[in-house]
């Protein structure tokens, strides 16, 4: 039966391939014949480099950093080892990032990508207008102390308005601000579960069960309490509302 299925699938695929006229692609390398050709080649190289780095840059310029760190702290506080798995936590953080950043991304698309595709602006202007909403989001969620740190390191004057903050300063300041916020939330998450661990450990010691790991006994109580208080609803809701 499997062989018949593979045969039919292959036959249909080959028939469709023969019926479809694919355009011919010719790749060739040649030396630039004019300065304009060299500039165009360099522009293509820069664009390809940005495309490779874009996913990492977008992640550190959005709410993803705070979300994934907090979810990691939650799993450690619950003591559930690999549950939820890393892939699920990353997927949840990505989905919530899309939800939080949707207004910013829409504004970036309307101001930069759409006019660029319509050939109304150049790629340099499109880059500036496309990054502007993300930079505004980062500055709103960045502590002034962190911004001042990188201005002092680069020996730059303090800007008169948020729009004048360079992107090279806004990104690292935003990252360390997000890490600090995530660690503060992680500390608050740890406290109730730490109390449960201490209570269970004290009860086991009073009963003379010193060889029994307290984590094994406390984990079901942690999960029960987390479910009873609707922990995911509280955590995700407060995380989303924590962004300005």
Residue spans for each PLM region:
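N-terminal secretory/membrane targeting signals
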Residues: 1-18
